Structures are given as C-alpha cells and as structure tokens.
C-alpha cells in the first residue's frame, strides 16, 4: 500500500469499514494492536520495561491492547493513562476493562515514562486538530526527554496528519506503525523527522474503490 491519504480519507475509510461493511471497531482495534505488537518484536527494541502512554480515544485503545499483548508475553508493561476513563470511547473503555483483568498497572506518574526502556505513544491519532497543551504536552515532553526509544501508533502524537506540522509539541518517534495507508503529513520533512521508520499495517481498512472492485 504505497498510497498516502489525508485525515478525511482515513476517517472515511474507517467509517466505511465499520458502518457499511460491518467490521466491528473492536476488530479493527485488535488488528492495529497486533500489527504494532509484531513490529515491536521484530525491531531492535529493549522490552525490559515498556510504558504505553495512552489517552482515552481510540488511539489510546490501540495502545492499551498492545499493553495486554505484551503482558501476555511476559513483558513488564505499565499504562500511563491520560484523561478521564469515564469519557473513554466504548472500545477504549472495553480495552481498559480487559487490561484490568490482566492486572496491568495503570499510573499517572511521569517517572514511569522517564524510567522506561521502550515507550509506546498512543495519545493522539489522525484526528488531532488543535495544539497540544496541559498534561498531554507534559507527557509528550517526558517522552521526548526519556532515554528510551519510542514507537508511535498511526501518527506521532502532536503531528498534523495532513500537513506534518507540529501542533504545539509532538512526539519524536523512532518508529511509527501507521494503519491502512501512510499519511500525507508523515511524508513532509517535519513529519518524517518525527515518525522515524514507518511501517504501514494492513488491518482491513481500504479505499472504497478497492472495496468495490473486490465485490
């Protein structure tokens, strides 16, 4: 999949997969998590102490699912949670319940980020439209200050997926697992600098013309 897409296209293809084709959003989330997890294992990362920095949107849900896959494999993993769990998307709320079943620690201690050997960035996906501030900016600054390598899910948090612009502050990742298609903003100079090595993951979301051609 060499095509690069806009935010609007990413959202439209996602909605078509769930609302028209009927693929449950949880299935897509699990596929995104598994793709990210496999890239973590295949690349040269130190998995001694992994911290997944997740917010309560669906990008965060992807990360929380990654945390569970790591825990099942016997890897020391902690979730640094940003935002109120009561306001989580339905899928992310479910992922938090599953993480709780597996006794995955959830923290709000920034020192956990500082002491990690690998950080998974699952704060913001393609839908970010305003500058990052407050505790979200604090978390991104902590990620960038840490010695650990960082893997971003879909796009580095704080990067505009259309323009590649830094929205106040942005994660500088060593690797990014982006879903379905690359994003136009990650092809810009700044986008490339923040994304690191890009892995495009086929999770079952396609452009409508490809879907219709397959029917």
UniProtKB/Swiss-Prot annotation:
<keyword id="KW-0479">Metal-binding</keyword>
<keyword id="KW-0520">NAD</keyword>
<dbReference type="InterPro" id="IPR032976">
    <property type="entry name" value="YJEFN_prot_NAXE-like"/>
</dbReference>
<feature type="binding site">
    <location>
        <position position="157"/>
    </location>
    <ligand>
        <name>K(+)</name>
    </ligand>
</feature>
<protein>
    <recommendedName>
        <fullName>NAD(P)H-hydrate epimerase</fullName>
        <ecNumber>5.1.99.6</ecNumber>
    </recommendedName>
</protein>
<feature type="domain" description="YjeF N-terminal">
    <location>
        <begin position="10"/>
        <end position="211"/>
    </location>
</feature>
<keyword id="KW-0630">Potassium</keyword>
<dbReference type="InterPro" id="IPR036652">
    <property type="entry name" value="YjeF_N_dom_sf"/>
</dbReference>
<feature type="binding site">
    <location>
        <position position="121"/>
    </location>
    <ligand>
        <name>K(+)</name>
    </ligand>
</feature>
<feature type="binding site">
    <location>
        <begin position="58"/>
        <end position="62"/>
    </location>
    <ligand>
        <name>(6S)-NADPHX</name>
    </ligand>
</feature>
<keyword id="KW-0547">Nucleotide-binding</keyword>
<feature type="binding site">
    <location>
        <position position="59"/>
    </location>
    <ligand>
        <name>K(+)</name>
    </ligand>
</feature>
<keyword id="KW-0413">Isomerase</keyword>
<comment type="similarity">
    <text>Belongs to the NnrE/AIBP family.</text>
</comment>
<dbReference type="InterPro" id="IPR004443">
    <property type="entry name" value="YjeF_N_dom"/>
</dbReference>
<comment type="function">
    <text>Catalyzes the epimerization of the S- and R-forms of NAD(P)HX, a damaged form of NAD(P)H that is a result of enzymatic or heat-dependent hydration. This is a prerequisite for the S-specific NAD(P)H-hydrate dehydratase to allow the repair of both epimers of NAD(P)HX.</text>
</comment>
<dbReference type="GO" id="GO:0052856">
    <property type="term" value="F:NAD(P)HX epimerase activity"/>
</dbReference>
<dbReference type="GO" id="GO:0000166">
    <property type="term" value="F:nucleotide binding"/>
</dbReference>
<dbReference type="GO" id="GO:0046872">
    <property type="term" value="F:metal ion binding"/>
</dbReference>
<feature type="binding site">
    <location>
        <begin position="125"/>
        <end position="131"/>
    </location>
    <ligand>
        <name>(6S)-NADPHX</name>
    </ligand>
</feature>
<dbReference type="Pfam" id="PF03853">
    <property type="entry name" value="YjeF_N"/>
</dbReference>
<feature type="binding site">
    <location>
        <position position="154"/>
    </location>
    <ligand>
        <name>(6S)-NADPHX</name>
    </ligand>
</feature>
<keyword id="KW-0521">NADP</keyword>
């Amino acid at each position: 999949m060499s095509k690069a897409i806009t935010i609007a296209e990413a959202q439209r293809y996602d909605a078509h997969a769930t609302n028209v084709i009927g693929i449950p959003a949880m299935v897509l989330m699990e596929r995104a998590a598994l793709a990210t997890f496999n890239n973590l294992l295949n690349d040269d990362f130190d998995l001694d102490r992994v911290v997944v920095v997740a917010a309560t949107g669906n990008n965060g849900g992807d990360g929380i699912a990654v945390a569970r896959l790591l825990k099942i494999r016997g890897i020391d993993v902690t979730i640094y949670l940003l935002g109120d769990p009561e306001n989580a998307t339905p899928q992310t709320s479910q992922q938090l319940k599953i993480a709780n079943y597996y006794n995955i620690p959830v923290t709000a201690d920034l020192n956990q980020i500082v002491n990690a050997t690998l950080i998974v960035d699952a704060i913001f996906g393609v839908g970010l439209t305003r500058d990052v501030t407050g505790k979200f900016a604090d978390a991104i600054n902590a990620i960038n200050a840490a010695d650990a390598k960082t893997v971003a899910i879909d796009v580095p948090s704080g990067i505009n997926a259309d323009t590649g612009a830094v929205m106040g502050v942005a994660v500088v990742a060593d690797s990014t697992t982006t879903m379905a298609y690359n994003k136009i903003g990650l092809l810009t100079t700044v986008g490339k600098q923040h994304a690191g090595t890009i892995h495009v993951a086929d999770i079952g979301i396609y452009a409508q013309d490809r879907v219709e051609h397959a029917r």
